[in-house]
């Protein structure tokens, strides 16, 4: 077997412990039905060099991920210290008194003593114990961002997670959080890809020492119709000029922006291809062409119907 690729890491600017996160992670959002496939794919990913694994309570993949990582450690492929595991707090537990129990439950399911990163999945709270997806709007409750964040901070102080952050927060929602936070969020995980580049959010996060992690970096997910990234003629042209795939061009662009990313592929070849982005670069002309790509959001939100103010009109 080919040697595992060494993935670059990024230091959390707001971390006193100089904590490092691999720039590429493996996503595990639900579009699978077989737990065995998930487990096998994760073990294969470890063999290829992946060390960062992204899950969430709502994904239904924590158990399979935990079993796979336990086996990988048992096989001597990796140690727990080498791994970086992220999970997320679902909206039903997005209440101050439920954060710590939710994290403990995730740790038990993952068979881990601590997480490397724990994120608030959405800036929304809903009825405790009433899981539905999409979330019914009538189940939503006021989101106590200050109280929930204090509970997140407590999780970090207890050593149950090494770092805390958020997901799907707009600039405005980040500003609100920063105004009440004692421990600042280290990450905002959001949809980001070449057809949804989020320049304003990237600039705000850079100014405030927050790392952006891109989910749906290849614009796969809840898409209907053509994929504006993978079927883009401009990107096809750039990829051919470099002898690379469109996926590699897309991930290389994110890397050059200082963005981390968690593509999901359980295909052995694509999994490997997604790591071959560190020994070449896009040209200035490539960047100009990419900046001209038409922009639109793919994931509009987790509720039914959609909320008009979820993104605060952010482009």
From Swiss-Prot:
Keyword NADP: yes
Site (Lowers pKa of active site Tyr): 88
A GO MF term: aldose reductase (NADPH) activity
Binding site for substrate: 121
Enzyme class: transferase
Example GO biological process: flavonoid biosynthetic process
Catalytic activity, EC: 2.3.1.170
Family to which this protein belongs: Belongs to the aldo/keto reductase family.
Assembly and oligomerization: Monomer.
Name of the molecule in the record: NAD(P)H-dependent 6'-deoxychalcone synthase
The organism of origin for this protein: Glycine max (Soybean)
